């Protein structure tokens, strides 16, 4: 599964550190999500969607 978190974060002009803090995840874990090296829980994806002000489905990339 791939995620659009990094692209959306970049578009919104939000730093990795700020998004990690607001979504209550570690910066290193967020980096792994963006790199496709981690499979975040639905709860974490919901928090990321809320912070990024995007619908949850936009955070997932269909392959």
Task: Show the residue positions of the predicted features.
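Short alpha-helical DNA-recognition segment
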Residues: 13-32
């Amino acid at each position: 599964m791939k995620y659009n978190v990094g692209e959306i974060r970049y578009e919104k002009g939000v730093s990795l550190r700020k998004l990690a803090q607001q979504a209550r995840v570690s910066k290193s874990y967020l980096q792994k999500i963006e790199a496709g090296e981690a499979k975040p829980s639905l709860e974490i994806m919901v928090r990321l969607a809320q912070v990024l002000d995007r619908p949850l489905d936009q955070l997932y990339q269909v392959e």
